C-alpha cells in the first residue's frame, strides 16, 4: 500500500510563516496599545481627581522668629 505525503514547497512555507508572524505582531501591538491606553487613562483620572499637594501659601504659615 502506497502512502503519499504532501510536502509544501519553500515559497508556501515562507508565506505561511510570514502570515503567522504578521498575526503575532498585530496581536502584540494591540496588547501594547491596550496597556498604554489603560495606563494613560489611569494617570489622567488620577491627575484630575487629586489636587496637587505641596506647601500651603505663605499667608497661612506662622512667621519665623
From Swiss-Prot:
Membrane spanning residue stretches: none
UniProt keyword Cell cycle, yes or no: no
Entry keyword annotation includes Nucleotidyltransferase: no
Signal peptide: none
GO cellular component, one term: mitochondrial outer membrane
Keywords tagged on the record: Apoptosis
Other comment: Ectopic expression in the developing eye results in a small eye owing to excess cell death.
Function: Activator of apoptosis, as well as grim and hid, that acts on the effector Dredd.
Full protein name: Cell death protein rpr
Species the sequence originates in: Drosophila melanogaster
Recorded name of the encoding gene: rpr
